Amino acid sequence: MASLRLSVLLVSVSWLLLLVSGLRAGPRTLVLMENINLRETHSLFFRSLSDRGFDLSFKTADDPSLSLIKYGEFLYDNLIIFSPSVEDFGGNINIETISSFIDGGGSVLVAASSDIGDPLRELGSECGIEFDEEKTAVIDHHNYDISDPGQHTLIVADSENLLKAPTIVGKTPLNPILFRGVGMVADPDNPLVLDILTGSSTSYSFFPDKPITQYPHAVGKNTLLIAGLQARNNARVVFSGSLDFFSDSFFNSAVQKAASGSNRYAKTGNYELAMALSRWVFKEEGVLRVGEVSHHRVGESSPPSAYTVTDLVEYSIVIEKLSDGKWVPFDGDDIQLEFVRIDPFVRTFLKKNGGKYSVQFKLPDVYGVFQFKVDYNRLGYTHLYSTTQISVRPLQHTQYERFIPSAYPYYASAFSVMFGLFIFSIVFLHMKEKEKSD
């Protein structure tokens, strides 16, 4: 009996420990590295993720035990690829599994360099990003750092070249950004690609040790230094052409353009931008959700089984934003409601009313099956979509007006015809033909 109690106690303690560990574990993140030394050279970036609660698993990109999916389930929530020159991933990871991971809603952060391998190039093509050739680099003869060795590949990117989206790049002004790596261009037919950081008008991508004999792959503002993607399923991917961008040396380095009269900054803006990008790509920022949705006739509190045409209705929706791990009310002034039956019959702005958004409007004089639809798609935020289906019926016979003012001419014409027929009948019945004389 005592042994049975002891066994039950041990099992209970084990389940309790598993439950506690599951509650404490943060987002599971797999980090694929070029070599193990990256944990030291990029320690500030990884430490910031750990401090924010991420459960990091460090492995080399060619580790034979690598796996993203097991028994149809994703083993990780996020994927970091800091292995630019990898030619083949280890284990069962390949471009197909990474694409499936993105299709399943996973978040991916990719850092490349001039030594870029085919797998990252192929992954970029899947996401609408085209990397330049191996051994090429972004070159700018006007905006390079004072410590550049002479090839003008240590680029100083101004914060004015950042995407105007505080949710993605942060709200605070940034110092100039150091960049050394490969250039990218976006697929013009892919509207989901985000130009997060572009080169200046004097930048281009080419082989730094060769003379220019052909038109460069990327020129001017078309040269992407950092690009992003938010898929239609709200999965997020960020591509950086520079692995050094996330390094401790670039985080702590002073920065100054080589041009005379340029200002010197004690630190770059790399750390702040890297933190903002990681918070966005790993869905700590810019995540919206729909809370309670309600609708009813004005003056009532519950929805009817069916509305009647021309009813005055009130629609309310609660929209929340993820902030510091907590859901808080979202503040927006451009949220619209559509009342749709194939096409919108009503489109109006929702007004914030306390902790919810609401609006009152009159239903159209059209019956059928309609939807209250909120389709909110803004730069940097997850796609918010909410639909509620209702029925709108015509007026019942007892609900019509006894006399319709607009029908008075028809009433008059009907009664005039009746009156004329009555007079004609009297005249016709009492009319007597004159007798003919012999």
Swiss-Prot record:
* Membrane-protein topology: Single-pass type I membrane protein
GO BP field: protein glycosylation; protein N-linked glycosylation via asparagine
Residues on the membrane's Cytoplasmic side span 430-438
Q: Which GO terms describe its cellular component?
A: oligosaccharyltransferase complex
In the record, which residues are listed under signal peptide?
1-25
User: InterPro entries of this UniProt entry?
Assistant: DDOST_48_kDa_subunit (IPR005013), OST48_MD (IPR055459), OST48_N (IPR055457)
Record keywords:
Endoplasmic reticulum, Membrane, Signal, Transmembrane, Transmembrane helix
Where in the cell does this protein reside?
Endoplasmic reticulum membrane
Where are its TM segments located? 409-429
Q: Which residues lie on this side of the membrane: Lumenal?
A: 26-408
- List the Pfam families: OST48_MD (PF23358), OST48_N (PF03345)
Is Chloroplast one of the keywords UniProt gives this record? no
- Which family, according to the similarity comment? Belongs to the DDOST 48 kDa subunit family.
- Self-association or partners: how does it assemble? Component of the oligosaccharyltransferase (OST) complex.
Tell me the function of this protein: Subunit of the oligosaccharyl transferase (OST) complex that catalyzes the initial transfer of a defined glycan (Glc(3)Man(9)GlcNAc(2) in eukaryotes) from the lipid carrier dolichol-pyrophosphate to an asparagine residue within an Asn-X-Ser/Thr consensus motif in nascent polypeptide chains, the first step in protein N-glycosylation. N-glycosylation occurs cotranslationally and the complex associates with the Sec61 complex at the channel-forming translocon complex that mediates protein translocation across the endoplasmic reticulum (ER). All subunits are required for a maximal enzyme activity.
What is this protein called in UniProt? Answer: Dolichyl-diphosphooligosaccharide--protein glycosyltransferase 48 kDa subunit
Q: Which gene encodes it?
A: ddost
